[in-house]
């Protein structure tokens, strides 16, 4: 690009003052399949939950999110929250796991594959995949609202830092 207007049209200003120029872009999108189900896999510790992530990577999951005990505590009084949230051990950690498929038969196969993939590491309690809109939506609402919820619980005068960090997946448990 040589025309200054075209150059300006291809600039992007990101967070923390990042400036980028796009000369070419290709989007790779994720298919939003018709059927969705999610579950909460609860583990004794964050390290154990992190050790499950490499196993889940080998299965047909569409999303995995980690919620530590502080995250769970921040939503346990929500009227839609499961009662067992309030009785979890202080070290508990959960994984919100989602699967998607175009048909029920494929969903069942994916659920079986996920269960088999993580069977070697026990959860605190049995888990079930749910497509029930109320349960499904609460699980994702809880995850998506964490930043504001936890940020609001911090002591006065403190700051909530949010930074992206990356670790090799097989070192995730040790990193936590």
Task: Please place each PLM-identified region on the residue numbering.
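Noncatalytic alpha-helical scaffold of FAD-dependent oxidoreductases
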Residues: 1-176
